[in-house]
Amino acid sequence: MIQGAQTDFIHILKKYKKSKRYSELQELHIQCVVDELKGNNKEEHFHKFFEVLQSSLSTIGSFKFLVLCHKLIYQLQQEFAIRFIQNKLIPGDDTDKSRLAIYYYNFLFKLCENFDYYKEVIEFIETDNIEKFMKYELFVQIQILYPLAQILQELSQVVKLLDYLLCRESPLLLQLGTCILKDFCYTF
């Protein structure tokens, strides 16, 4: 395990949340989501977000779980945008932005503090078990990003197929399962 990640995960995360860089990342997150909702060009905020993230990581050390956390949260933007558009909550004034921020970061904090998930992810990466990591990522995406019953039903069939293919010893079946998994990760 990464030094400190197992014994002091929550403490480090809370300390990081109080830092100036984390506040800047929060603001950029919100602005990127607002850009997404309004259909604005988000390239500037997108690049700035990763600049700040890189700077942050060089300060606190090589905590891979923070990279994964921010990358996964960044992937959630489209889902948040869809939900807000469906509920006609396009942010226009500060009140709407505050509501968006509360909704967005309540979810962020819950995800960040899910130590078991990050412990698994870190172990997958450190043991170079990429197939297992990708498969686990797909399960997480299904559970978190796509809670609708119809989508779950469709994807559960894919998961069963992947589970079968990825457990085979045949290199060809393993390769097939990996290709399907990659395709679904990119698609969704």
Which ranges hold each PLM region?
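Eukaryote-specific intrinsically disordered, low-complexity regulatory regions enriched
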Residues: M1-F188
